[in-house]
Structures are given as C-alpha cells and as structure tokens.
Design a protein with these regions (language model features):
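Short, surface-exposed, charged amphipathic helix/loop patches that serve as local interaction elements
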Residues: 1-106
Length: 106
C-alpha cells in the first residue's frame, strides 16, 4: 500500500513524498517483534491491548515500511495519523478497499 504524504520528510538524507507499506509481508513473528520493540521504547503494553497502543501500531507500521520507528515519528501529525489509521485497519483484519467513508460535507 502506497501512502502519499501531505508533507515530505527526510530520513538518512533521502526525501520521501510517499511511503510504501507492505503489510502482506508481515508475519506473526513480526507482530511479536513489534510488541517487544514497543516495550523497549518504554511503553507498558497491557495484555490484549497492544493493538490499540499508538506506539505498538507505530512499530507495526515501521516494520511494514522497512523503516525505523524513529523515522516515522518525524512525519507531520496528519501523515502520522493517516499511517496509524491505515495500520489499524490492517490489524483489525478489515480490507481498506472495502471500507466506505461517508462524507457529508455541506
């Protein structure tokens, strides 16, 4: 899944205008590893609540993007939130292509 960024950011002297998240490549071990990375970052995860921790979701997103989680922390707030939301959709088992957004703008 490619996500176009609202604001470009730089990591290791490379400028990114979009990021590719390959959620299909992730394994169960990757999710366990993401939980451990989150704990090492000092975030206490309650059993069963890991999927809802922003820090855990960030760790999963970073694994899917093959970037360190610290790099994603430098994204704009809008881009960061969008990426976390897309990662939550993945973690919930929903297909983002089947989700509908009801836009009722006046």
């Amino acid at each position: 899944m490619r996500i176009k960024l609202i604001k470009t950011f730089t990591h290791n002297n490379k400028e990114y205008k979009e990021l590719n998240f390959d959620f299909d490549k992730l394994t169960g071990q990757d999710l366990i590893d993401a939980e451990e990375i989150t704990r090492r970052a000092g975030v206490n995860i309650a059993i069963g609540a890991a999927d809802f921790s922003r820090s855990y979701v960030l760790s999963v997103a970073a694994k899917a993007a093959s970037l360190p989680r610290e790099a994603l922390l430098n994204l704009s707030a809008q881009d960061f939130t969008n990426i976390l939301n897309q990662t939550l959709i993945f973690l919930s088992g929903a297909d983002s292509g089947t989700l509908e957004v009801n836009d009722k703008t006046a």
